[in-house]
Each structure stands twice: as structure tokens, then as C-alpha cells.
């Protein structure tokens, strides 16, 4: 088996679909010797900021001298990004070897595993073989029935900002969504919550009490955010002063405050994480595709906001970083998202939109998306490909800023197309 064949196997149609439940993952892991039982975890759930918070915590734990696994989704450029040890992606040959190891077990299961369950098993196997001392594990969807929730009590359960997303799978209210996320809270494990949504906070507090789990809510009154530049955001948080965070979204200091709070809670439970390591980890973290500046002048931004809650934060960042400016937006959005709410937030900042269809069956067709945009009185045109869309958006932008956003699923293609366009 080569890398392409391994990828074909992972993405094979027989694993397609979303089937909640932990039985299949447990069966698959048992056949592989239960590698997850050899590992310790930080488990991260939430609507927005999961990946950024996980990346920050992994960076800080690595700076503290630990061997750290990081499991995230989706990827931006290459699948291997989803499984990293100490900031290094799983090598192709290791991935092939592990797929060959998993295949006999997966192929003989009566209740067929999903793609995400196969990838979760792959990650667990790799982290165990790599002898990771701690794994930062990002939930795929929800919490309670997500395949990552096969783990025993984590060293810390972290719940990021909550908002309305995936209501079809998780339920129609913030309380339902919070209940799904709170499913990662295990008996007696420390919990750190972003908080700030009373309906959701009440659910998390109740579950933490039921599970005798020590709950810490982030004290954002101790966060002093100094604004920032197009290179870094500067902030102070609870004694940690003048931190230069290279993730420049205005919302990132709040994610950093959550990460810092969780790391300090872990320290009280015996983890050796000095303040100097927290600073180093935050100042050296890399997390592509989240309010990422690909070019300074004229500005070209790439952002992964893919729901109304995230879009609100991105729009605020655009206003903070580019005061008074209007944008050409290159947009693709999944058809199952609250498209109109997202567009209503973008419309006031738009000069024009260019729509494309991301390479996933869930994407709203570019022409349909353009019709939605025109309903807001904005000019919109479609492009036949992501490459053509990037070229057109840059052309329309002229000396003004361009921002590509709406889904993480086109981030890699946009990045590659932009690199090709400007390399000459």
C-alpha cells in the first residue's frame, strides 16, 4: 500500500456518513490492543475556537518539555496535519503502516465504522507508538457520542465558546448543544469552561456537579487586550503580561485565556508547566487558516469561520485590524449552515463578493450562494473554480483588502491558488 492508497482507504465510501455512538470505536480500538488506555489526554470540545485552543495548549505543553500529541480536524493542506507529535505531522510512511494495521480489523466489523472513527483509531495508535506523554484531543462533533469520547477521564476537559451550530445533530437550543459538549466531562476530572452563555453555563455546571468534577470558568475580567497589529495580538491575562500572540484574530486572546486557565489547572494537578513555558508556547504557536494574513499589502486574509457565531468574531477582527475599510470577499459556505445570518454580518463590510463551490458535497453551489448575497443588495459574481475565484477576487480587490472565508474546507485550495498567483 502507498500513501495514495492509504488515503483512498480512509476516505472510502463505505465509511461515509455520521453515526453517533462509541461502540464501533471501542470495538476497533480493542482489536488494536486499546492504545488509548496507554495515553493521557486533554479533551477539547466546543462550537468555536476548539482548534486554536488545542494548538495553543499543545504548544505550551511542548515548551514545558512534554512529548505532546495533537489531534484536530479538518485539515487545511494535507490530511497528515490532523495527527501531530511535537508539532510534526505524521509521516506518510507511518500513516501507511498504521492503515495497514487497522485495515484487517475495520474490514471485519459488522457495524461498519465511520471515516472519523477510523481516523481516531489511527491517531490513538500513532500517539501510543510515539510514547506521547499527553495528547490534546479535539472533539469532532458534539462530545457525548463523538468517537474521541472513548477515553477515560482526561487530565482536563476544556469547553470552548458555545454557539448555535450542528443543531440537526445536537439539538435546537444552546442547552442541548451544551449538554452534548458536557458529555466529555468524566467522573472527578478537572473542567475548564469558556462560559459567558447563561443557558449553556447552567448545563455545564450541573453536569460538573453530578460528576464531582472541579469546574473553573475563565475570568475574562483579568484579560487586558491591547489591540494588535497585522503580525501579533498583544494582551495581559491574570499576571501573564505583554504576550505577543501570532494568531491575529481579535477573538484569539480569549481563546488564549482559556488555554492558560486550563494549563494552570493542570499545574495544580501535578503537571510541570512553568509560566515561562506558557509564554513561549503562546508566542510560537502556529494555527493556519484562522484569520491568517497571507499577504500584508494589499492584504489577503484567509479565515475559517463557518457559522454565524464564528463569523461575528471574524467581522469584529476585520473592523479592528482594518478600520473603515471595505473588502472583496471570496466565499464558500456549507448548505447546512445558517447562510443568511452569516451573509448579513458580512454585507456591511463588502465592496463585492466572489462565490465558489468548495470541493465537498455539503457546499452550497456558487450560483445559489450568489443569489443569497444579492438579496442583501450586494454585488456578487461566481467563479467556476477556486483558482479562478482567487484570481478574480485579487483583481477586483486592487489595492484594497481581500478576505477568503466561509468554510475551512476550501482553505487549502485558496492558499495554494494564492501562492501560485503571486509567485510570478
Predicted features and spans:
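N-terminal leader/targeting and accessory segments in enzymes
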Residues: 1-48, 52-67, 76-78, 190-193, ...
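ATP-dependent carboxylate-amine ligase catalytic core
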Residues: 18, 22, 26-37, 63-152, ...
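Nucleotide phosphate-binding/pyrophosphate-handling subdomain across enzymes
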Residues: 37-38, 134-137, 145-158, 162-163, ...
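Hydrophobic alpha-helical packing residues
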Residues: 57-62, 127, 346, 373
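Acidic, Mg2+-coordinating active-site environments of NTP-dependent enzymes
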Residues: 110-111, 118, 131-138, 154-242, ...
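Beta-strand->loop->alpha-helix junctions that form or flank phosphate-binding loops
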Residues: 194-195, 207-229, 246-250, 278-284, ...
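C-terminal helical cap/extension that packs against the catalytic core
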Residues: 197-216, 230-231, 299-302, 308, ...
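Glycine/aspartate-rich loop-and-adjacent alpha/beta segment that forms the canonical ThDP
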Residues: 408-424
Amino acid at each position: 500500500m502507498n500513501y495514495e492508497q492509504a488515503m483512498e482507504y480512509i476516505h472510502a465510501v463505505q465509511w461515509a456518513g455520521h453515526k453517533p455512538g462509541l461502540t464501533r470505536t471501542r470495538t476497533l480500538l480493542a482489536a488494536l490492543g486499546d492504545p488509548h488506555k496507554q495515553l493521557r489526554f486533554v479533551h477539547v470540545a466546543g462550537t468555536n475556537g476548539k482548534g486554536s485552543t488545542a494548538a495553543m495548549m499543545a504548544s505550551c505543553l511542548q515548551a514545558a518539555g512534554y512529548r505532546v500529541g495533537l489531534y484536530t480536524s479538518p485539515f487545511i493542506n494535507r490530511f497528515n496535519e490532523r495527527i501531530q507529535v511535537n508539532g510534526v505531522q505524521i509521516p506518510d510512511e507511518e500513516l501507511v503502516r498504521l492503515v495497514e494495521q487497522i485495515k484487517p480489523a475495520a474490514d471485519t466489523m459488522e457495524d461498519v465504522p465511520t471515516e472519523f472513527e477510523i481516523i481516531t483509531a489511527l491517531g490513538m495508535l500513532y500517539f501510543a507508538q510515539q510514547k506521547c506523554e499527553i495528547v490534546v484531543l479535539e472533539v469532532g462533533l458534539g462530545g457525548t457520542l463523538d468517537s474521541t469520547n472513548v477515553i477515560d477521564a482526561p487530565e482536563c476537559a476544556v469547553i470552548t465558546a458555545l454557539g448555535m451550530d450542528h443543531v440537526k445533530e445536537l439539538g435546537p437550543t444552546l442547552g442541548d448543544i451544551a449538554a452534548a459538549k458536557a458529555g466529555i466531562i468524566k467522573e472527578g476530572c478537572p473542567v475548564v469552561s469558556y462560559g459567558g452563555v447563561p443557558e449553556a453555563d447552567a448545563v455545564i455546571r450541573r453536569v460538573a456537579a453530578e460528576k464531582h468534577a472541579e469546574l473553573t470558568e475563565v475570568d475574562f475580567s483579568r484579560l487586558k487586550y491591547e489591540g494588535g497589529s497585522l503580525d501579533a495580538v498583544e494582551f495581559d491575562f491574570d499576571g501573564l503580561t505583554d504576550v505577543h500572540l501570532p494568531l491575529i484574530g481579535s477573538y484569539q486572546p480569549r481563546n488564549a485565556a482559556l488555554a492558560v486557565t486550563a494549563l494552570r489547572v493542570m499545574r495544580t494537578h501535578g503537571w510541570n508547566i512553568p509560566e515561562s513555558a506558557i509564554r513561549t508556547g503562546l508566542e510560537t504557536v502556529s494555527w493556519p487558516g484562522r484569520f491568517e494574513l497571507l499577504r500584508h499589502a494589499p492584504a489577503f486574509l484567509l479565515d475559517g469561520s463557518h457559522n454565524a457565531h464564528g463569523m461575528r468574531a471574524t467581522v469584529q477582527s476585520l473592523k479592528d485590524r482594518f478600520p473603515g475599510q471595505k473588502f472583496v470577499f471570496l466565499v464558500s459556505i456549507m448548505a447546512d449552515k445558517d447562510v443568511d445570518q452569516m451573509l448579513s454580518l458580512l454585507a456591511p463590510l463588502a465592496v463585492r463578493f466572489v462565490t465558489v463551490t468548495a470541493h465537498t458535497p455539503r457546499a452550497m453551489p456558487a450560483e445559489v450562494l450568489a443569489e443569497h448575497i444579492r438579496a442583501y443588495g450586494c454585488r456578487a459574481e461566481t467563479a467556476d473554480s477556486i483558482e479562478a475565484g482567487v484570481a478574480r477576487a485579487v483583481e477586483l480587490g486592487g489595492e484594497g483588502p481581500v478576505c477568503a472565508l466561509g468554510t475551512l474546507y476550501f482553505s487549502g485550495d485558496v492558499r495554494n491558488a494564492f501562492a501560485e498567483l503571486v509567485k510570478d
